[in-house]
Each structure stands twice: as C-alpha cells, then as structure tokens.
Amino acid sequence: MTAQKMTAQEIIAFIGNAVKKTTVKVTFEGELAGAVPAEVTKLGNVLFGDWKDVEPLLANLTENVDYVVEQDGRNSAVPLLDKRNINARIEPGAIIRDQVTIGDNAVIMMGAVINIGAEIGPGTMIDMGAILGGRATVGKNSHIGAGAVLAGVIEPASAEPVRVGDNVLVGANAVVIEGVQIGSGSVVAAGAIVTQDVPENVVVAGVPARIIKEIDAQTQQKTALEEALRTL
C-alpha cells in the first residue's frame, strides 16, 4: 500500500488541522431517549464514536441504566492505519499510524510502532518492539531487529529523517539517530548507536558505531533473509 509521500510541513499541517477525537466504544443497558446522530454508529446495544457525541446519549438512558466505556486515546489527531487492503503480514499488537507506506510482502511483528509518514519497502521485516519514527524510510528486503529504533523527525521540520537502504540488517536494540543514512547491503550490529552515515556493504558496530569490516561471503550467509517468512 502506498500512501501519499508527505513532507514534514505537510505532516505538521495534517496533525494541526485534524479534528481531535476521543474515540470510544460503549456497551450499554437501557434505552436511548434521543436520536443517534450520524457521527455515532449504533449496533445493538453498542455505540461507536467520539466521546463528545456519545456522552449526551448516555445522559439520557432510560430504564436499566448502566454502561461500560472502552477507549485508547484522548484528543487523538492521527488515526491508526486501515490495514484491511495491505498486501503484507501484520501481526496483532503492531501500532501503525495513518499515512504510512508498507510494501508488498513486508512483515510487521507484534509490538512494532510505526509513526506517521514512515515508509517500509517490499519484503522488509520490522521485528518485535522496533520503532520507526516519523518519516523514517526503509528500503526493500531489509530487516529491522527487535527493539531497534530509527529516530523520527517531524519537528524541527528542517531536519532530515533516517533512511535505510535495500538489503540492510539492523540488529536488535540498535539506534539510528535522526538524519543518518544506512547504505544498501550494510549490517548494523546489535546495540550499536549510529550517529553518522554508513556507506554500502559494510558492517558497523559499537557506541558510537564504527566500520569494523566490509561485507564478505560469511557475513552474507549469516544475515540472509528467509523468504518463507514473507510468504502470504
């Protein structure tokens, strides 16, 4: 699925101009005294909508008055991504905001957090608990390890986002600082903190990360992707 590519200023405007909503699901007993407005969806004894539209209905319940409110945000500006038509494997518990691009056969594991404006290429895996900040970009057939962070940039608007190339492996709990670019074919070792651009086809490790060697056949074998994990 390809979302419209947004600049930092466009994302800021999108958030600033968005109608802020506190979306709720309310299960109630009793009868609603008033008409249900168009902004609220009623299915049996369940209401879905913004709290400001739902609350007045609950105030006018008659007979066996009781209800339970479920919510997961307050004055939210950015909805979660509608994942129904995405040609990728997205596991339960991944948090993906709207205006994110996810390529075919990508894999998003449970606990991953992907912010507005991020781009994930075809065949790329975002592992458990990894974080892609706003506008972070990952190319095709890459792997972002569990707990890794690609720092996001929405403000200041002038800053550059993280860009990761194709066929890159970022190890578990590594951190890539704002504006850094990781060249295609490179490997970032687990726990590394990357503060400078990384050229293509090298291995970096350490705090701060430094080049420790060029990619060789042994490294390629150890970091090879498993296509079966990307089969839908």
From Swiss-Prot:
Coiled-coil residue windows: none
Pfam families (UniProt xref): DapH_N (PF08503), Hexapep (PF00132), Hexapep_2 (PF14602)
EC class (word): transferase
EC nos: 2.3.1.89
GO molecular function, one term: tetrahydrodipicolinate N-acetyltransferase activity
Catalyses which reaction(s): (S)-2,3,4,5-tetrahydrodipicolinate + acetyl-CoA + H2O = L-2-acetamido-6-oxoheptanedioate + CoA
Keywords assigned: Acyltransferase, Amino-acid biosynthesis, Diaminopimelate biosynthesis, Lysine biosynthesis, Repeat, Transferase
Example GO biological process: diaminopimelate biosynthetic process
InterPro entries: DapH, DapH_N, Hexapep, Hexapep_transf_CS, Trans_hexapeptide_repeat, Trimer_LpxA-like_sf
Pathway membership: Amino-acid biosynthesis; L-lysine biosynthesis via DAP pathway; LL-2,6-diaminopimelate from (S)-tetrahydrodipicolinate (acetylase route): step 1/3
Role according to the record: Catalyzes the transfer of an acetyl group from acetyl-CoA to tetrahydrodipicolinate.
Family statement drawn from the similarity comment of this UniProt entry: Belongs to the transferase hexapeptide repeat family. DapH subfamily.
Protein's UniProt name: 2,3,4,5-tetrahydropyridine-2,6-dicarboxylate N-acetyltransferase
Source organism of this protein record: Streptococcus suis (strain 05ZYH33)
Classification of source organism: Bacteria, Bacillati, Bacillota, Bacilli, Lactobacillales
Gene: dapH
